[in-house]
Amino acid sequence: MRAIRTVAVNVFLESVRDRVLYNLVLFAVILIASSYLLGQLTAGQDVKIIKDLGLSAISVFGLFIAIFIGIGLVSKEVERRSIYALLSKPVSRSQFVTGKYIGLVLTLAVNVAVMVAALYLVLGYLSWRETAAFKLSWDAPGPDPRLMKAVFLTFLELMLVTALAVFFSTFSTPMLSAVLTFGLYLAGQFNADLKNFDKVVDSQVAVWLSRAAYHVLPDFSSFDVKTQVVHGLPVSPGYLASTAAYGLAYIVALVLAGTFIFSRRDFK
């Protein structure tokens, strides 16, 4: 565990020094703050627009961080030949990959926390500025604690994207890892549609392939509850628990697969 912790801390410290990371987070915070101005253009819908744009900004910029830092976590060490020095230390390859993943998850957690704080500050200001009579027209309060349900699932989604990026980086180039990770992310957004593919095609082979893809591809759409939260609709604890269990199981499988592949690579 000490070796994993050391690798994770090094990844975290290296990531927070990355200027690209600061630029992404700064741009996300500016976008969240700007949503207040956009909300003023739509009477009665301002709080919904701020919540929707804020949660979307957290998801999109978190995705950029997960992919563009995650794809180079392992391959960068191989390209710089620093992998030899790292593996000569008392660190196994499985500890190396696991530590890299945990380090990036810590980086994501800090940056998501910053963006969430910015969103709640904007919502808090809006709630303070508006009259009590006007706030009665809102479906949910401004700084609504239930927003954290959407943030929780969004963070799990980003953890899964990170696991994909780290998995691909154990055996492919950064460019290919980015393409594969982003491609699977997009495909996973439409995973639920594959379940009913037999209703739109007649080919039995296509139906079998779609069902296989449905069970293999990660269902990223299940992590998206922004619409329900923004409109004050309930998201049950059971749904949160089952989705979290699904995401964590997929993450563990990807990290284990990545460590298995990386442990068998020959760097000579």
Question: What does each model-identified segment do?
Answer:
Residues 32-73, 97-171, 197-199, 210-214, ...:
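Secretory targeting signals
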Residues 77, 90, 171-172, 264:
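Helix-loop interface residues and adjacent transmembrane-helix termini in multi-pass membrane transporters
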Residues 19-40, 56-67, 177-189:
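Hydrophobic alpha-helical transmembrane segments of multi-pass membrane transport/permease proteins
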Residues 36, 227-268:
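Alpha-helical transmembrane segments of multi-pass membrane transporters/translocases
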Residues 1-22:
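Aromatic- and glycine-rich beta-strand/loop motifs that create alpha-glucan
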Residues 14, 75, 86-88, 165, ...:
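Helix-capping/transition residues at the boundaries of transmembrane alpha-helices
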Residues 67-87, 91-93:
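Transmembrane helix boundary and interhelical loop/hinge segments in multi-pass membrane proteins
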Residues 24-28, 100-101, 108-109, 181-182, ...:
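Residue-level recognition of transmembrane alpha-helices
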